[in-house]
Amino acid sequence: MSRNSVAAAVTLSGLVEELRADSRLGPQIVHSAYLPAQAARHAELEPPLPAALAAALARGGVERLWCHQAAGVAAVRRRRDVLITTPTASGKSLVFQLPALAEAAAGGPGRGLFLFPLKALGQDQRGKLRRLAADAGLDEEQAGCEIYDGDTPAARRAAIRKRLPRVLISNPDMLHLGILGHWTSWGPLLADLSWIVLDELHTYRGIFGSHFHHVLQRLLRLCRSVGGDPVLIASSATAANAGQFAADLTGRPFEWIAESGAPREGRHLLLVRPDGSPYTAALRLFVRCLDAGLKTIVFTKARRITELLYSWLRRQEPALASRVASYRAGFLPEERRDVERALFAGTLDGVISTSALEMGIDVGGLDACILVGYPGSMMATWQRSGRVGRDGRESITMMVAMPDALDQYFLDHPQQFLERPCERLVVDPGNQPVARGHLLCAAAELPLEPRQDAAYLERHRTSLDELLRQGQLLQAAPAPPEPPGAEPPAAEPRPEGEIFCLRRHPQRLIQLRGTGNTYAILAGAAGAGKAAAGGEPGPGG
């Protein structure tokens, strides 16, 4: 155990004892548990990484790969689609960073398209990839990495299309509207595409997942049309059926790696039944953690509660006000980035957040997590708890129960809270209204061929037949025989059976995350898709 982790362990053990002995808070703690540390397990890659890349990793503290990282990279080398579901902070991103940088070091043609459901995740990954590439001696020509999303200025977009990077970072919304809808401008990228990264795969459930299934099918179809054959690399939170979910979402089987080789320090867990307001109890615990020198994150279930707790803290503990921030969707992107940077730099000691900080943006080393109410799923619970305890430090998670039945059940049955498996993920690729919209997009991008696209068309036969009946899709009939001596046709007739769409830009009719409504925000207005792509999903916003 490192010196830092020993110090943290002493601090956290002492804090738990102090809280239990506290005349006010002690009686409210109904259960405490300690989840012991896990040792690291390493594995070697054969053949090894390029020497310069291995040296860059070593300088960053990664002298050997953990076994799940090595297994993931090896699967990608074998051209296998791979799914990684190891815990938060287990280094999953190296599984997709290393193949791209190794290809760059070897001077190969392969390119990567890294898709993140939130813009902030893409910004975070670009910084990490660029730093690792520079440390390995790779320049922009060899290992360029660019972001192409709704915030990218028009002139910059044109420059990216003209000079394609090794890795293009985007999100599903921009892929749907800005890339697939204008795919002929991206032909060289699609032809050389070796890896498609699907980060935070568990977010693609429900109606968003139904849409994304079709966006991905359209992308893969266009890749095939120009000779591309990319491997899918997916990472996800732990789920009971992650492998089947990935197969349902993408239509392809995955090599599923769930066992982590990353070390994990011990974790303390407290379940709290407040004798009054859960918000007051959570605020008291927050202040105690900050006074103990612990970097702390509080997760609430609603934006209003986030701002309420932040307001109470500023009023009741003015000395702490400059050390704490709130974080939620509805903030402008730069406001959120400022909070993320301050947390990472250590200039903030605490943050009160909705689910917006649940996913893997790196905000540095946090020690304590306070859940104001059960988050609604074990998957979200462990995702949020996993935001603390990085960098070889022990951590503490406290759940302050709300008065509803499920929260109270877990307090009465704490082993259920500790042992309950994560939930199953559900996606419906066969959703017919969704399928109809994307069939129009696919046919507008590249006419559907009954032979080449047989599997896709058969899966959505009902939706296809309806669009043909309505005349929204058209199918080329056999060309009539030409009379002797007739002039050749001015235009080449369409191949028999080809299915095409005359509507221009049907992509604009589809919002992947909503219904196409417009939302008012502080600085103006944004369409539902753009607002959602720039915001943070979740019950609290």
Q: What name fits each language-model region?
A:
Residues 10, 16-60, 64-67, 71-93, ...:
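Helicase motor core with emphasis on the C-terminal RecA-like subdomain
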Residues 519, 526-541:
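Beta-strand/loop-dominated core regions that host nucleotide or nucleotide-derived cofactor-binding catalytic loops
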